[in-house]
C-alpha cells in the first residue's frame, strides 16, 4: 500500500468512526489553493474540522506530530473560508486530529487538538 492509499484508507476509517459517533459528514477533502481539510463534520451544533493521519508504525513519530504549525495554519485558513462561505459565524467549531494506526487496526481521536 503506497502513502496515497494509506491516506485514503485512513480517511475512510475516520469517516466511519465519526458516523458511528453520530456525526454528519459535510465535506471530504475540502480543498482551496491554500490547503485542504480532510473531513468537515457536524455533531450536534458543532462543526468539526478533522485532519486524519495514518501510520503503519511510529518509527517516524506519532501521527499527530506531523501536524505542524504550518499545517495547522493552513487548516485554520481553509476553515475560516468555509465558515464565512457557509454563514457559520456563530456556530461552535473545533479542530480534531484522528490518528489511524494501520497495523494495530485502531484509531486515536484527539478532540480540540489545536
Swiss-Prot record:
Family annotation (InterPro entries): Restrct_endonuc-II-like, tRNA_endonuc-like_dom_sf, UPF0102_YraN-like
Listed SUPFAM superfamilies: Restriction endonuclease-like
GO MF annotation, one: nucleic acid binding
Pfam families, alphabetized: UPF0102
Stated family: Belongs to the UPF0102 family.
NCBIfam families tied to this protein: PRK12497.1-3, YraN family protein
Name of this protein: UPF0102 protein CD630_12710
Organism per entry: Clostridioides difficile (strain 630) (Peptoclostridium difficile)
Amino acid at each position: 500500500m503506497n502513502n496515497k492509499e494509506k491516506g485514503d484508507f485512513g480517511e475512510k476509517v475516520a469517516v466511519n468512526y465519526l458516523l458511528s459517533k453520530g456525526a454528519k459528514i459535510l465535506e471530504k477533502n475540502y480543498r482551496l489553493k491554500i490547503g485542504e481539510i480532510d473531513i468537515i463534520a457536524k455533531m450536534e451544533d458543532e462543526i468539526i474540522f478533522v485532519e486524519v493521519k495514518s501510520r503503519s508504525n511510529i518509527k517516524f513519530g506519532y501521527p499527530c506530530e506531523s501536524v505542524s504549525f504550518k499545517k495547522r495554519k493552513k487548516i485554520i485558513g481553509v476553515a475560516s473560508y468555509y465558515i464565512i462561505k457557509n454563514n457559520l459565524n456563530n456556530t461552535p467549531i473545533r479542530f480534531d486530529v484522528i490518528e489511524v494506526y494501520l497495523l494495530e487496526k485502531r484509531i486515536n481521536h484527539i478532540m480540540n487538538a489545536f
